[in-house]
Amino acid sequence: MAQAGPTPQQAIARLRAEIEQHNIRYYVHDDPSVPDAEYDALMRDLQALEAEHPELVTPDSPTQRVGAAPLAEFGSVRHAVPMLSLGNAFDEEDVRAFDKRVADTLRGAGLLGLDQQVEYFCELKLDGLAISLRYEEGRLAQAATRGDGQTGEDVTANIRTIKGVPLRLHGAPRVLEVRGEVLMNRAEFERLNRTQAARGEKVFVNPRNAAAGSLRQLDPRITAQRPLRFFAYSWGEVHGLPEGMPTRFDEPAPGVRVASTLPRDTHGGMLDWLAELGLPVNLRHNHRERGADGLLAFYERIGKLRADLPYDIDGVVYKVDALPSQRVLGFVARAPRFALAHKFPAEEAVTQLLGIEVQVGRTGAITPVARLAPVFVGGVTVTNATLHNEDEIRRKDVRIGDTVIVRRAGDVIPEVVGPVLEKRPADAREFVMLTACPICGSAIERPESEAIARCTGGLFCAAQRKQTLLHAAGRKALDIEGLGEKLIDQLVDADRVKSLADIYSLTAFELAALERMGKKSAENLVAAIDQARRPALGRLLFALGIRHVGETTARDVARHFGSMERIMDASEEALLAVPDVGGVVAGSIRRFFAEPHNREIVEQLTQQGVHPQAEAEPEGTSLAGKTFVLTGTMPNWTRDEATRRILAAGGKVSGSVSKKTAYLVTGEDAGSKLTKAQELGVPVLDEDGLKALLGL
């Protein structure tokens, strides 16, 4: 009797297992085991069988990566274990200081001998989007972005479309949360941009931007078409190890044994274990090193390889390898004490300076901008770069037609470093500052002793008007949600809005007719404008955009005078009576309100029903008059929230540390302000310390 063939269920299980193994060979080991055509044939066979037997289709089948129906919006996901960021190092001194802190702490805990060096696990710092994958009973249950570290966006449907992300793990704990990076290889990025351009669609500025934009598509079918990759580099919640796996014990201190929920006792060992489960782990360039010298050698070695890697990195990461030692070192603010990101310096490139144009800012500041032949630097294609001001152009001797060195300062703002003089052409031309504004034709003047030239057109100048309106609508001023740059451009270009007061006369009907504005958006914007008719007096004063008058100064002046009328009529002597207001600020306020047009705008605001509310007097506390400086990112409060609470308690907030500073409040990436505070003996608080000082 002939032996019966496999049942449909058995055939489907065999095909799935075979495809999963090929995926592991390809994405985890970077070692394809079959040609693409054979892999595609297996997928077609599986798709055909599942089409014949739809009752056998399960969510973890390789065929289910094609993408689900579009979403209306992303849901929120609360991370069971916060996704922390890392402290940064930018030079050798930072790395040596980190290694010393770690070694001193571990020696104090009896985990490191006096003649021993700390062993670190060194990894590449991938330049993509941080993601958390949650597996339950071995199946991918949820995927979320990092978000603010506490709460991210649910991108499960999109993550499922990435072929390198296993939908099922064999031998995994009951719950396993995997952290990693979604990115796009440079070659795939360039191919995607060519396709986008051929279709007349938006091109992306760099691989990270492309990866983030692809992952955050509301339609997973679009994400499925994008060449995304995933690499695991850490873990979050882990519990319920598989049966048969022995319990491992850690020794966080001599003579102390603690049962661990993890199967390995080193960071590198855990990454090996994740790879054994079938997760893609970027192990090729990872390495163990001892002490600061070893870390710096790794940094130098990877720096030389950086340009040859298929993907972008922006540094390397050092982690104490022993997990018991990590536990002893613990955390500070939003970063672990046992890990450090060592950033690469800003990248430089050479290109041609095609021309110099000027931009007009909110206060009329004229900024020269270099127009460049496109050049890829610091991870993006750069065509414009700042030249700061006329004096800088003269100092650097930059001329139109020069071959110039371009640097992405801080990896954000491109700047021209200087010319390559040996390549200067004979017809290179010196820059001549304009005498009239290119936008409104008003005279350009450069006040004595200032480096910045300015357009004298004021709000007559459309460029200044746009920037002034954008400033006024901002969160620290009138906080008009929905009134952004593109909308302001349309309103000013159409001559519908000539001053701040005109904003308050906008109707939902006319707003709905604008580009990218529907009826609902228009109604929401009108509602936001209505809410801004009773702002705090300080906010309205700040919204007017008076030069040298910042948020804190505006609030102090408002609190001192109590009404806009009294501020407008105040003499320079009266303004100087406001604490911390000097001659420059007092003179600027007087000149602003001496201009009839500016007083007219305030009157028009009143006619539109804008009635500022007096600033509340601060509660009488011991903080009255004390100056605080904020630096870094706090775990829970934004800088605006911390500022608001300090001001409400009668304190002041400054942007720089001095002998007059009462407290420095630090968060993640505190930087040079912390160093200066320590030099001056200024007390340093973290967020909890600030809350305690405020009695919260």
Curated annotation (Swiss-Prot):
SMART domains xrefs: BRCT, HhH1, LIGANc
Entries under InterPro entries matching the protein: BRCT_dom, BRCT_dom_sf, DisA/LigA_HHH, DNA_ligase, DNA_ligase_AS, DNA_ligase_CS, DNAligase_adenylation, DNAligase_N
Binding residues for Zn(2+): C437, C440, C455, C461
Record keywords, A-Z: DNA damage, DNA repair, DNA replication, Ligase, Magnesium, Manganese, Metal-binding, NAD, Zinc
Required cofactor names: Mg(2+); Mn(2+)
Active site per the UniProt annotation: K125 (n6-amp-lysine intermediate)
Sequence positions that bind NAD(+): D36, A37, E38, Y39, D40, S85, L86, E123, R146, E181, K319, K343
Chain ranges of the BRCT domain: 618-696
Assigned GO CC terms: cytosol
GO biological process, one term: DNA repair
Keyword Glycosyltransferase among record annotations: no
Reactions performed catalytically: NAD(+) + (deoxyribonucleotide)n-3'-hydroxyl + 5'-phospho-(deoxyribonucleotide)m = (deoxyribonucleotide)n+m + AMP + beta-nicotinamide D-nucleotide
Enzyme class: ligase
Protein role: DNA ligase that catalyzes the formation of phosphodiester linkages between 5'-phosphoryl and 3'-hydroxyl groups in double-stranded DNA using NAD as a coenzyme and as the energy source for the reaction. It is essential for DNA replication and repair of damaged DNA.
Protein name, per record: DNA ligase
Species per Swiss-Prot/TrEMBL record: Bordetella pertussis (strain Tohama I / ATCC BAA-589 / NCTC 13251)
Designated gene of the protein: ligA
